[in-house]
Amino acid sequence: MVEVLVVVSIMGILSAMGVAGLQRAIANARIKDAAVNTAAFVERVANLSSQRNEVLCLKIDPGSPQTVIVVLDDEKKDCSSPKNGVVAEYSIESPAKYVQRSAGCPSIMTDWFGQNAQVAFKPRLGLAATPPEGGICIQYGGDDIYGAVRKDRTRNRVIPMWKAGNDGTQNSSWANWTEL
């Protein structure tokens, strides 16, 4: 009887350790998926801006941090006072959420949810309508697991990225991020 109890308790301990590792793997997979799918949505917004010949802006839905909405810009073309009416939207699965200037994302990144001329999706002849640089940051719940969609001036495409952990010493660069 004691032997059975020992075996059952060992199995319980081992399975609990496996579940904890599995939950971390699930979180990593979900944030990677959110980054890749958000990158595809950003490309779609850029194409939509060119097709409609309009300036579009990204905003986090006030009712849901899992949803990004696309709205038309006003006459200033700097996303400072977007018009009402959602042109498109995209949602990711909870507990992943879109965040503005998170502690886990590089401080050098221009946040596309902001209000200035550098964050507007503008039709540009021969180039993608995405802003020249910057991106979007995604966090998995309250954990230090992050996804990002970024663009820099040297590439004419958006890049989905991922990292686990928050080393505050490297928040000024993309050195500890992995491209997907």
Where are these regions (language model features)?
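Phosphate-interacting basic helix/loop segments used at nucleotide- and nucleic-acid interfaces
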Residues: A40-R44
